[in-house]
Every structure is written in C-alpha cells, then in structure tokens.
Amino acid sequence: MTEEMKFFLFLIERYAQFKGRPTGEVLREWDRKGITQEIYDGYWQYHQEAIQNAYMDIDSLTATGRHAFS
C-alpha cells in the first residue's frame, strides 16, 4: 500500500469521525460529487499541514467544488 493510500484512509476515517458520520457515507458523498480523486491527490498538501486545514479544504470542495486555499 502506498503512503498516499495510507494517508487517504487515515484522512477519510478521521474526517468521518470529525463529522460524526460513517466512513462509507462520506466516501459515497465524495464519489457522488466527483471529488474523491481530488482529495486523494491532495496528499502532498494535506499531509504537511494541520489536519484541520484538510477538513476545511474538503468542506469547501464538498460545498463549492473548489479548494479553500486556491
């Protein structure tokens, strides 16, 4: 398993916990909105920052389809 995949799994589990939602539900929402790959590709940004920054960016992607920190 790649470091990117390990981090993605960590991120989605922590994000789901932060939101009080099941992980599968979060993944289905990301898939439905077409942002799963975008979040996965955010590894190089997300793993270097506070996890709360990743949450803010994911919330922005979910709501608007755009990154919070563009």
Regions inferred by a protein language model and the residue ranges of each:
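N-terminal acidic leader/helix
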Residues: 1-25
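Generic N-terminal helix/loop capping motif
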Residues: 18, 33-36, 61-68
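A generic structural signal for solvent-exposed, polar alpha-helical segments
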Residues: 13, 21, 36, 49-52, ...
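Low-complexity, intrinsically disordered/propeptide-like segments
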Residues: 12-14, 30, 64
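Intrinsically disordered, low-complexity segments enriched in small/polar residues
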Residues: 5, 13, 41-44, 53
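Long, compositionally biased
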Residues: 43-70
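Generic detector of well-ordered alpha-helical segments enriched in charged/polar residues
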Residues: 9, 24-27, 40, 52-59
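Amphipathic, hydrophobic secondary-structure cores in small proteins
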Residues: 17, 23-46
